[in-house]
């Protein structure tokens, strides 16, 4: 619907009210503006009859539109016209790309540059600047980082996971092969109320097999061991032996075992299967006797997980993440955390405890969350790789884009009812107790200890909200949560939110709330073009250093047509990260998004790392993140760049960042060149202290559309040294102080 603008009669004083429909029959939203450019936060005050009676039709630019026609003062029209002109100019800058460099830099010769360090201006910067953001999108968890090989192991898939898809049900990924046996789903007497569905096999004559296809198959590696487990019972009390096989597409048995189900009650049965071949297989469970069998939580897990953890993570994927050296991990997601509607808000308590007692739910990205990868596993992974955990919880409201658009209160659906907010806030406080509480003295500390981790996880950060519409509904609930955390856990660093963009109403109102409450940190998000990042390297230079609130750039990425990841996008991000290091006194954390994507199951591009069942495929941008993560510092050494070319188009495409790691004493020089020609650079490190003459150099370079790997070698350095910065390149030079090994 075209929004109608109801303009007050006192044009220079009154706000203009923009009103729009939430559905076809009643309910509406409103926002106000003095100039039709800057708007207040949205409100959903009451229901109203249909707008058709107050609208008129008009032909605008050759097309019929519906709305109101109002007489306004010229200053308002003039302001709109000037704003349009400014946006057109800004969009032209944001549209700059290397594809235009042939024309833009026709005849450009190699540039000479001097990079001079200014150690007297050194400043401390965040020691947790570069991290990772894990969201369960693109099959990142089940079928991805979570090492479980059986899909729909709990028979809890439901059509509601995928917008009513009838084929997405409790039998998805399962099939019965053979005759004289039936396969049905029951809920009469489950293992746990949170896991109500289970399989029932009625065997009239042995020979049939219950099969599971896994996630695009089950990939085995020769000689590796796999833990098979199953909850089962024989209601009639007659024992039944199960043959368990892993079979490839040609019918070859690549691994097998057997076990006997003998209990009338639910019981766990376990066995180990050793792979006879490297193959893509499926699971077969073949009962050897007649009678009824009940089966649930059918699991196949590689023993060779990351750090050898039970119920752990896929080793190669987890290692690629660990190699970034992320100083923190944000989880379990952004949109996943605040959910698609009130009923879909992520509840952390449903993800801890025994696997059979965890409560699965719909993933708003169109599939299922088993919760096998739950809060315990997230915290454990953070600990395993030395990263700070940063859990994100809903701020009492779901995503404003929730599918229930017909709700009269908008996508936020009025938020969690006030009668329930006390319990919801207690859940958040319980999370902090679960993470940090004494294993013997606190209720939730004991729960953590019972899961195998008696020592506290030492949680320091907690995110409240994600990209939320900053409405009165949000503000009221966020404030309640924030004040409760501040009162009970004053040392906790709460990370708030300022909407989904780096400008606009939610950004402005979100920052107002941060200033009002004194929120320690806010989470900014923006996915932008190469030209935006190129022309906004000073975005945080202008930040008010007197503010108490720090910035977490929680989601960002460079987007180009086709959403590809290549040298163009990677170098753009390298250039911007140099600016973020420069502003590391106010930008406390950063994380690229999204992190993982399974080939054939993506809902978003680009992603940092793609994978399938056998391969991990880091993008070019991954290596930029890795180079910054492995070469981080906690002291920023300002530098001055002097060029022999005064063209601003040249200047803004060359960047340098010099940091020192106090733990090692190493000085790290990062140089970025987004020009199509070499930059002959003299690096002057006078004043930083004695250094070794040999340094490690890593270079990532190629044509804009290329996807190369970085090349590492050594180079000679001195207090002053020359270096030819290749066209379209990112170079990291790590220099040790003298007398260090």
Predicted regions and their residues:
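Carbohydrate-active catalytic/glycan-binding domains of CAZyme proteins
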Residues: 1-3, 7-108
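Solvent-exposed strand-to-loop "edge" motifs in beta-rich extracellular domains
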Residues: 231-236, 274-276, 630, 672-674, ...
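An active-site-proximal structural segment forming one wall of the substrate-binding cleft
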Residues: 275, 281-282, 305, 309-326, ...
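The substrate-binding groove and active-site-proximal loops of carbohydrate-active enzymes
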Residues: 301-309, 357-372, 409-422, 460-475, ...
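Extracellular and organelle-lumenal recognition/adhesion modules and their flexible linkers in secreted
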Residues: 95-370, 388-390, 405-419, 489, ...
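C-terminal beta-strand-rich structural cap/linker in extracellular carbohydrate-active enzymes
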Residues: 713-741
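Carbohydrate-binding surface patches
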Residues: 651-691
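Catalytic-core region of carbohydrate-active enzymes that cleave or remodel glycosidic bonds
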Residues: 483-486, 490-493, 511-514, 520-631, ...
């Amino acid at each position: 619907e075209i929004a109608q603008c109801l303009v007050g009669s006192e044009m220079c004083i009154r706000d203009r009210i923009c009103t729009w429909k939430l559905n076809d029959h009643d309910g509406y939203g409103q926002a106000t503006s003095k100039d039709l450019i800057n708007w207040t936060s949205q409100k959903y005050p009451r229901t109203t009859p249909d707008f058709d009676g107050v609208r008129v039709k008009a032909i605008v630019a050759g097309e019929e539109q519906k709305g109101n026609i109002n007489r306004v003062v010229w200053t308002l029209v003039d302001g709109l016209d000037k704003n349009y002109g400014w946006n057109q100019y800004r969009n032209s800058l944001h549209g700059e790309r290397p594809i235009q460099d042939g024309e833009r830099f026709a005849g450009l010769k190699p540039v000479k540059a001097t990079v001079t360090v200014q150690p007297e201006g050194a400043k401390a910067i965040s020691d947790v600047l570069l991290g990772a953001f894990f969201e369960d999108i693109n099959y990142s968890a089940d079928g991805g980082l979570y090492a479980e090989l059986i899909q729909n192991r709990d028979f809890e898939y439901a059509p509601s996971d995928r917008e009513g898809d009838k084929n997405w049900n409790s039998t998805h990924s399962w099939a019965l092969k053979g005759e004289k046996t039936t396969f049905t789903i029951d809920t009469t007497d489950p293992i746990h109320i949170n896991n109500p569905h289970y399989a029932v096999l009625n065997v009239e004559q042995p020979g049939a097999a219950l099969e599971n296809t896994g996630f695009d198959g089950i990939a085995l590696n020769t000689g590796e061991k796999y833990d098979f487990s199953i909850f089962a019972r024989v209601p009639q009390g007659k024992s039944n032996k199960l043959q368990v096989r892993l079979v490839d597409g040609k019918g070859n048995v690549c691994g097998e075992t057997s076990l006997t189900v003998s209990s009338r009650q639910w019981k766990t049965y376990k066995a180990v299967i050793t792979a006879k071949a490297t193959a893509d297989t499926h699971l077969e469970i073949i009962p050897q006797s007649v009678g009824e069998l009940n089966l649930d939580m059918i699991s196949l897990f590689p023993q060779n997980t990351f750090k050898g953890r039970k119920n752990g993570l896929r080793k190669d994927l987890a290692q690629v993440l660990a190699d970034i050296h992320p100083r923190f991990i944000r989880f379990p997601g952004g949109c996943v955390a605040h959910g698609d509607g009130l009923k879909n808000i992520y509840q952390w308590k449903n993800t801890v405890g025994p696997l059979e007692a965890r409560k699965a739910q719909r993933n708003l990205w169109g599939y299922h969350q088993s919760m096998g990868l739950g809060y315990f596993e997230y915290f454990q992974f953070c600990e395993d790789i030395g990263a700070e955990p940063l859990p994100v919880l809903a701020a009492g409201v779901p995503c404003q884009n929730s599918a229930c658009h017909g709700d009269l209160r908008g996508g936020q659906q009025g938020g969690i009812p006030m009668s329930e907010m006390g319990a919801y806030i207690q859940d958040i406080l319980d999370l902090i107790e679960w993470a940090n509480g004494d294993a013997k003295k606190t209720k939730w500390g004991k729960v953590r200890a019972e899961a195998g981790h008696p020592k506290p996880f030492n949680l320091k950060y907690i995110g409240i909200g994600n990209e939320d519409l900053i409405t009165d509904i949000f503000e009221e609930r966020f404030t309640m949560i924030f004040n409760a955390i501040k009162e009970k856990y004053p040392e906790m660093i709460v990370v708030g939110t300022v909407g989904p963009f780096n400008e606009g109403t939610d950004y402005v109102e979100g920052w107002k709330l941060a200033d009002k409450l004194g929120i320690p940190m806010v989470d900014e998000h923006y996915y932008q073009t190469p030209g935006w990042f190129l022309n906004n390297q000073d975005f945080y230079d202008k930040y008010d250093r007197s503010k108490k609130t720090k910035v977490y750039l929680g989601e960002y990425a460079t987007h180009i047509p086709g959403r590809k990841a290549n040298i163009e996008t990677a170098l753009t991000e390298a250039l911007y990260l140099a600016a973020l290091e420069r502003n590391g006194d106010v930008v406390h954390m950063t994380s690229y998004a999204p992190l993982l994507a399974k080939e054939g199951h993506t809902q978003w591009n680009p992603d940092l790392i793609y994978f399938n069942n056998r391969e991990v495929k880091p993008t070019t941008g991954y290596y930029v993140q890795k180079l910054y993560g492995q070469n981080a510092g906690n002291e920023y050494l300002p530098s001055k760049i002097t060029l022999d070319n005064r063209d601003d188009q040249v200047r803004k495409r060359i960047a340098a960042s010099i940091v020192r790691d106090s733990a090692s004493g190493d000085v790290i020089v990062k140089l970025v060149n987004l020009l199509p020609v070499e930059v002959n650079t003299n690096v002057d490190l006078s004043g930083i202290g004695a250094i070794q003459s040999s340094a490690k150099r890593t270079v990532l370079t190629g044509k804009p559309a290329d996807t190369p790997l970085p090349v590492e070698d050594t180079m000679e350095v001195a207090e002053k040294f020359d270096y030819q910065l290749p066209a379209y390149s990112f170079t990291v030079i790590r220099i040790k102080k003298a007398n260090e090994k």
